[in-house]
Amino acid sequence: MKDIKKDPFDEYIRNLPPTRKELGQAWSTAIGLQDVDGLKPSEYLYETAKKSIDGEITIDEAGALINSYYEDKEGRSDSEERTEEADKVSARIAKLLSDKAFIFSPMQYISIHRELFAGIYSHAGEIRDYNITKKEWVLDGDSVSYGSAINLRDTLDYDFSQERNFKYDGLSLDETIHHLAVFISRLWQIHVFCEGNTRTTAVFFIKYLRMLGFDAENDSFAENSWYFRNALVRANYTNIQKGIYETTDFLEKFLRNLLLNVKYTLHNREMHISGKFLSVQDDPINDPINDPIKLEGREKQILDILYENPSITRVEMAKRIGCSESTVKRTLQKLMDKGAIKRIGSNKKGEWIIVYKK
């Protein structure tokens, strides 16, 4: 006899796969996060991601295909090894972001690092046992003061206990965002691991924000992951002699875009402590949103439509605007050439991702 108290849909719900939109967002974020270490995934990774988004393969099968792809490659150069890291870690991040399971704990944080970098770093999931410094572009070659190796675990446990006991009730959204910026910047500053700290912190933070009830599913991490890292750096750096003080202002701008769908344009050059990159002409960052994109009338029309409906077809766009489908196709290509939009998924089932910010 069946248990009438048991929810007949319980098993189905528990095993419900992520939606195409969620998969697309997970892959986009996963790929974008490789920028924090200057890594670029291969074309094979993009092809595999598209198959996953289109439902041709599962997220687990995508990871297996990536692993198999590199098993057959021997004698790789340094650049090829970096591409392999980008591909494998992208697939693993996409899987973690597609999984709703999460516990707010130091062990979860460490586990994420292990899952992302197992077989890539020999120290995956291990707390570092030596002190580190890192020259930062945004600090004009200076370094943040990272956590001391002798008490990393104690520091990590302390930060988690402080956040676990923090009460968000009664806070305004601005106060909440400020607190979240302080928490995540302090967690990142510990730099528990030898490598891979920013990507681990980003994945953990996204899952924590979801646990708090936030929708962290827009393109902020996908398009501005290096800005996120530089903002973390500026939140942890003070040089009184130079008149530079730690600030979460940049990180809070990023979080407002992420959590409140605000449309701040995020410029890495604005964070450089020297101020020498504030003019567009001196901007060294090869970033499609660093410099203004000039759009023509038809391009603006199509962009407005894509903001409303990223899944709209060319035929539907042509009807909306009152032009031919071939005109829409040419305009979309111009927008892609200018770096204003990009396409994820197949022609039939894909979606447009807006890079240009109004």
Question: Can you say where each PLM-predicted feature lies in the sequence?
Answer:
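FIC/Doc superfamily catalytic core
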Residues: 1-358
